[in-house]
Amino acid sequence: MNFNATLIGQSITFIFFVWFSMKFVWPPIMNALETRKKQIADGLAAADRGKHELELAAKKAGDNMRDAKAQAAEVIAQAEKRAAQIVEEAKLAAKEEGDRQLAAAQANIEQEANRAREGLREQVAALAVAGAEKILRREVNAQTHADLLSQLKAEL
């Protein structure tokens, strides 16, 4: 066996194997590697986008929370203001009712006082008439007149 012929045969076989591999085996391997490389790049990009979206969502959630707190504080302030207003209205209504009742009581007292005065006037008039009647029936003398007036004073 000739060593040169074997070496040439092996070289031709190796060249054929390299050509066959470059023509039929290498392109699918390169395509698979490119596809995998693209998938990895897409995954990393998606992870970056997801991270960015997560940051935006966290920021938006914080903004929404601040807005909700502000709205809640505003609602509470309005409720407190309305409660104070209701209390003031109730105080005013109570004061008006008290003033009205006081005025009614004063009017009632005034009416009762007027009735009492009128009654006293009638009694004084009756006593005066009775006294005058007694004076006219008796003799008119100073001592009797003074006694009758003292008696009338005592009765008044």
From Swiss-Prot:
<feature type="transmembrane region" description="Helical">
    <location>
        <begin position="7"/>
        <end position="29"/>
    </location>
</feature>
<comment type="function">
    <text>Component of the F(0) channel, it forms part of the peripheral stalk, linking F(1) to F(0).</text>
</comment>
<keyword id="KW-0066">ATP synthesis</keyword>
<keyword id="KW-1133">Transmembrane helix</keyword>
<comment type="subunit">
    <text>F-type ATPases have 2 components, F(1) - the catalytic core - and F(0) - the membrane proton channel. F(1) has five subunits: alpha(3), beta(3), gamma(1), delta(1), epsilon(1). F(0) has three main subunits: a(1), b(2) and c(10-14). The alpha and beta chains form an alternating ring which encloses part of the gamma chain. F(1) is attached to F(0) by a central stalk formed by the gamma and epsilon chains, while a peripheral stalk is formed by the delta and b chains.</text>
</comment>
<comment type="similarity">
    <text>Belongs to the ATPase B chain family.</text>
</comment>
<dbReference type="Pfam" id="PF00430">
    <property type="entry name" value="ATP-synt_B"/>
</dbReference>
<comment type="function">
    <text>F(1)F(0) ATP synthase produces ATP from ADP in the presence of a proton or sodium gradient. F-type ATPases consist of two structural domains, F(1) containing the extramembraneous catalytic core and F(0) containing the membrane proton channel, linked together by a central stalk and a peripheral stalk. During catalysis, ATP synthesis in the catalytic domain of F(1) is coupled via a rotary mechanism of the central stalk subunits to proton translocation.</text>
</comment>
<keyword id="KW-0813">Transport</keyword>
<dbReference type="GO" id="GO:0045259">
    <property type="term" value="C:proton-transporting ATP synthase complex"/>
</dbReference>
<keyword id="KW-0138">CF(0)</keyword>
<dbReference type="GO" id="GO:0046961">
    <property type="term" value="F:proton-transporting ATPase activity, rotational mechanism"/>
</dbReference>
<dbReference type="InterPro" id="IPR002146">
    <property type="entry name" value="ATP_synth_b/b'su_bac/chlpt"/>
</dbReference>
<keyword id="KW-0997">Cell inner membrane</keyword>
<dbReference type="InterPro" id="IPR028987">
    <property type="entry name" value="ATP_synth_B-like_membr_sf"/>
</dbReference>
<keyword id="KW-0406">Ion transport</keyword>
<keyword id="KW-0472">Membrane</keyword>
<dbReference type="GO" id="GO:0005886">
    <property type="term" value="C:plasma membrane"/>
</dbReference>
<keyword id="KW-1003">Cell membrane</keyword>
<dbReference type="GO" id="GO:0046933">
    <property type="term" value="F:proton-transporting ATP synthase activity, rotational mechanism"/>
</dbReference>
<keyword id="KW-0375">Hydrogen ion transport</keyword>
<dbReference type="InterPro" id="IPR050059">
    <property type="entry name" value="ATP_synthase_B_chain"/>
</dbReference>
<protein>
    <recommendedName>
        <fullName>ATP synthase subunit b</fullName>
    </recommendedName>
</protein>
<dbReference type="InterPro" id="IPR005864">
    <property type="entry name" value="ATP_synth_F0_bsu_bac"/>
</dbReference>
<keyword id="KW-0812">Transmembrane</keyword>
